[in-house]
Amino acid sequence: MANLDLSKYGITGVTEIVHNPSYDVLFAEETKPGLEGFEKGQVTNMGAVNVMTGVYTGRSPKDKFFVKDETSENTVWWTSEEYKNDNKPVDAKCWAAVKDLATKELSNKRLFVVDAFCGANENSRLKLRFIMEVAWQAHFVTNMFIRPTAEELANFGEPDFVIMNASKAKVENYKELGLNSETAVVFNLTEKIQVILNTWYGGEMKKGMFSYMNYLLPLNGMASMHCSANTDKEGKSSAIFFGLSGTGKTTLSTDPKRLLIGDDEHGWDDEGVFNFEGGCYAKVINLDKESEPDIWNAIKRDALLENCTVNAEGEINFADKSVTENTRVSYPIYHIENIVKPVSKGPHAKQVIFLSADAFGVLPPVSILNAEQTKYYFLSGFTAKLAGTERGITEPTPTFSACFGAAFLSLHPTKYGEELVKKMEKTGAKAYLVNTGWNGTGKRISIKDTRGIIDAILDGSIDKAPTKVMPYFDFVVPTELPGVDPKILDPRDTYECACQWEEKAKDLAGRFIKNFAKFTGNEAGKALVAAGPKL
């Protein structure tokens, strides 16, 4: 299969193409003697290889751009003064320059080419071609995307999208090209190419394709979602879990009683819910065997660790965040035992769960949402972190990320809300807002109680529970649930005085109202204001 012609992309003089290498070949290539710098993988005593990604230990949203042309001009949700996002425009001249840099970097070299699928549903999946000069980057995409069978590879044909990773090349004249730095991640929706320059972070390839799926699917009547998903063991219904980083998406969807569809990116079409990916990309900071056995056990040969501290004996220090807090592992999804096989897809979702880690201590541990509230809280995409300030006081900082994934939305957020609710209405799915954060005790809600809440949602007992309505937010909350401490279900009961909750609730309600103003530029957004908090 090494007779691939890369000259049509402008890559010439290639000395050898290693096409869809096996895991054994990848292991040998990324650990072979003589590799230097960030190309070098270190074998750990768990069997997985660890690599370092240099100065970029996460995505670089400031360096993400789309070429503005006839294809994209009226479809992409462009950044604007009043509402900044990561979809920044560049012109044809800039594109020609960055593409030229990438093709020059990749020409006259020995290259890795990985052909893979994005999307587990045959009728909507994309054929991707990744071109790179670094072995472990080929390993990363082999883990993260859907690996074609030998027969599918033989009949792969032309890809739908091409990703050129030229992480060794720098954009020195970035200022005159209208870029942000020497690093650039640029998409051309007409040529269907993504170019990556001067960042080694693996996640740029993963999230790049998520941004593209987020562009295509809603325009074709499918929901595209930043969520994890699982199904019951009988495969009768799915549940989807939306949530920003650190809210428990991966942890809560990995459930011994259920089968995992995927942990991060999914579509929902007329047949059901499907994974975009063939692997998982889990955070491993402070990873502990007891509390996250599935992820722990997935770290073995063929898994790829990023930016972990590993000593000369190959021992991994998961608590060390000296390089970054965003230490990660990618592994093929079959490293997790409880998964949907052979294809990562499931039936229509019956439960849609929005996870928020509310550091303000206001949101109830679980609220049952109506259709309008579903749209409102989906567009709000709220969570909050506790950030240390200079005097050691820990203050909550709110994050509002539209659709629980604003960084990856290529179209206007209301489009994703529309598609999601359309699918929910068609299948009779219900939405729940689950707070995995803090309450009046100053402690985080226990994972035991949160799991009890998720169980009650999934087995339907929450729909039979007695309820009451919370002030300001009009949330319907259960007053008792099996296996859950009843004293936490109304957050007011966790404070010495309900007045303390009221004060915080007014503050948070005001923040929701202020944030939502940015969606009221169109009729769909205006109509939802009434579903939000009221002061």
From Swiss-Prot:
* Co-factor note (free text): Binds 1 Mn(2+) ion per subunit.
Any idea which UniProt keywords this protein has?
ATP-binding, Cytoplasm, Decarboxylase, Gluconeogenesis, Lyase, Manganese, Metal-binding, Nucleotide-binding
Pathway noted in the entry: Carbohydrate biosynthesis; gluconeogenesis
Name the reaction it catalyses.
Answer: oxaloacetate + ATP = phosphoenolpyruvate + ADP + CO2
Checking Pfam families in the record gives: PEPCK_ATP
Q: Where does Mn(2+) bind?
A: 207, 226, 264
Q: Where does ATP bind?
A: 207, 226, 243-251, 292, 328, 444-445, 450
Instruction: Kindly provide the name given to this protein in its UniProt entry.
Output: Phosphoenolpyruvate carboxykinase (ATP)
Provide the organism lineage as a comma list: Bacteria, Pseudomonadati, Bacteroidota, Bacteroidia, Bacteroidales
| Gene that produces this protein | pckA
